[in-house]
A protein has these predicted regions:
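N-terminal Sec-pathway targeting helices
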Residues: 1-16, 22-23
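Asparagine-rich low-complexity intrinsically disordered tracts
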Residues: 2-9, 38, 58, 202, ...
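Short low-polarity hydrophobic stretches
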Residues: 13-19, 39, 60-63, 243, ...
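Membrane-interface motif at the C-terminal end of an N-terminal transmembrane signal
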Residues: 15-52
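Acidic, Gly/Ser/Thr-rich repeat motifs that build Ca2+-stabilized beta-propeller blades
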Residues: 55-262, 296-299, 303-305
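Short loop segments at secondary-structure junctions
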Residues: 248, 279-280
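Loop-centered beta-sheet repeat module
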Residues: 265-277, 283-305
Length: 305
């Protein structure tokens, strides 16, 4: 009986729809009477949202095209210093603080949010090295950096030959996680897509000799375990990635657990750990475990802490 009633209701709605479609005046009167008074405003809002999304999508595409063009070609990027300057006091020492704006690229699929990726920097002699979250390397001389307007010079790398999964270049939660320069060698930590495993990742390190024309990275350290997107709580933001110089022979790396919490407690993998890694052999030793997402890492050589 219930099934027959449902069929009858559907037939009635179909007949009404046919009648309305065949009588334009009646259709307009029907919608004018029954539609909400502010439906026009709502429609305009929806149209504006889609228009904004279209503009942002085009902007994102243009930025991505530009990124693809300059990552393999030397180019100068402008830096602008802000007018505001101030003195800050830290541990009884005064520091001169000045803000600079640097052009980087959209690295998020959430176009409406206009999320920008992170960037990392370290010093090499009299130059400041900078890398964006999506792998764009550049440098500037410190004396030039102090000027009102200056330029970053991009450096070509082989990053795109090593890191081929799309999220590295398009989503801020993936990508480069830190930069460390020791003597003439440069290290970057990043979220690595594990070969042979679909949508599975861990925190790893690339290493290269500094070269102002082209930096040729090689794989230096790869974690022994990974977490896949299929895991219910997977989150690439919880990846750690801080690198610091430890001693003459080793560096320290923090790794996250990608919210697979049990792996941080397991000493048979490298997730959710502080790891000591030999600079030459890349052999490692776990020195601390049970971490979710270590973002601050500092080693005090004076008291070995």
């Amino acid at each position: 009986m219930k099934k027959k009633n449902k069929i009858l209701i559907i037939i009635v709605f179909i007949l009404i729809a046919i009648f309305l479609l065949n009588n334009r005046t009646t259709t307009l009167s029907f919608f004018k009477y029954y539609a909400p008074q502010k439906i026009g405003e709502k429609v305009k809002e929806i149209v504006n949202i889609f228009s904004l999304y279209k503009d942002l999508k085009e902007k994102h595409l243009n930025l991505q095209i530009r990124f693809n063009n300059i990552i393999d070609n030397e180019e100068k990027l402008p830096i602008y210093s802000e007018d505001e300057e101030k003195i800050v006091k830290i541990a009884d020492k005064e520091f001169y603080l000045k803000t600079f704006s640097i052009p980087f690229f959209l690295t998020s699929k959430n176009l409406l949010a206009e999320t920008f990726g992170s960037f990392y920097m370290d010093f090499y002699k009299k130059d400041l090295f900078v890398v964006s979250g999506n792998g764009l390397f550049s440098y500037i001389n410190i004396d030039e950096f102090k000027k009102k307007e200056s330029e970053l010079i991009t450096i070509t790398t082989n990053i795109k030959k090593i890191i081929k999964y799309n999220e590295f270049y398009t989503e801020s939660r993936f990508g480069v996680k830190d930069l460390l320069i020791i003597d003439d060698e440069i290290y970057i930590s990043y979220i690595k897509s594990i070969n042979g495993e679909k949508d599975c990742f861990n925190t790893s390190i690339l290493k290269a000799k500094i070269n102002f024309k082209k930096i040729e990275f090689k794989e230096f350290f790869t974690g022994t375990s990974f977490v896949c997107k299929s895991y219910v709580d997977f989150n690439a933001h919880s990846s750690g990635g801080r690198i610091v110089n430890y001693d003459d022979d080793n560096i320290l790396l923090s790794t996250g657990e990608f919210l697979d919490r049990t792996k941080a407690q397991n000493l048979n993998n490298t997730l959710g750990k502080i790891i000591k890694i030999n600079k030459k052999s890349s052999n490692y030793e776990i020195i601390s475990f049970g971490h979710r997402n270590v973002q601050g890492l500092f080693f005090n050589k004076n008291n070995n802490t």
